[in-house]
């Protein structure tokens, strides 16, 4: 794998640091008036999702991580693992529940997700940016009830709870942004 100098750090670059893969989120190169130049880096630990701030000297370097983002289709959950399949090779991967974490509430059958593989092992799952799901439970919207914020909680067929406008009813299909968890529109 390639070696990257701290001068080459860019957002999106995946490196090995302390034996684990990290994704660089931001990098600021600083040249003080006195002393050696350095890079102030914010990065995310891919195995846990935690964020780390680290300062690298200009002479430091890190090896590139052998991490691959792959589009895969979500198949099913057997209670212990979430199963994904590569659409071209039909290779299947079982992903542990702790790895899927918050993405689980957005998963629908055959949804195309981005699965991050490290040494052939799934370490992260990113759901599609937008999903269309049916509303299974919400309060009825009463005519003239517009005082307040103008929204009500609704449970989707995936199990996620989102805030929707008062006019949305049970059985309607809505479009939701999975990155923010916000209602986008009704689907006709």
Swiss-Prot record:
It is found in: Cytoplasm. May be beta-lysylated on the epsilon-amino group of Lys-34 by the combined action of EpmA and EpmB, and then hydroxylated on the C5 position of the same residue by EpmC (if this protein is present). Lysylation is critical for the stimulatory effect of EF-P on peptide-bond formation. The lysylation moiety may extend toward the peptidyltransferase center and stabilize the terminal 3-CCA end of the tRNA. Hydroxylation of the C5 position on Lys-34 may allow additional potential stabilizing hydrogen-bond interactions with the P-tRNA. Involved in peptide bond synthesis. Alleviates ribosome stalling that occurs when 3 or more consecutive Pro residues or the sequence PPG is present in a protein, possibly by augmenting the peptidyl transferase activity of the ribosome. Modification of Lys-34 is required for alleviation. This is Elongation factor P. CDD domains: S1_EF-P_repeat_1, S1_EF-P_repeat_2. GO terms for biological process: peptide biosynthetic process. One of its GO terms (molecular function) is translation elongation factor activity. The gene is efp. Disulfide bonds: none annotated.
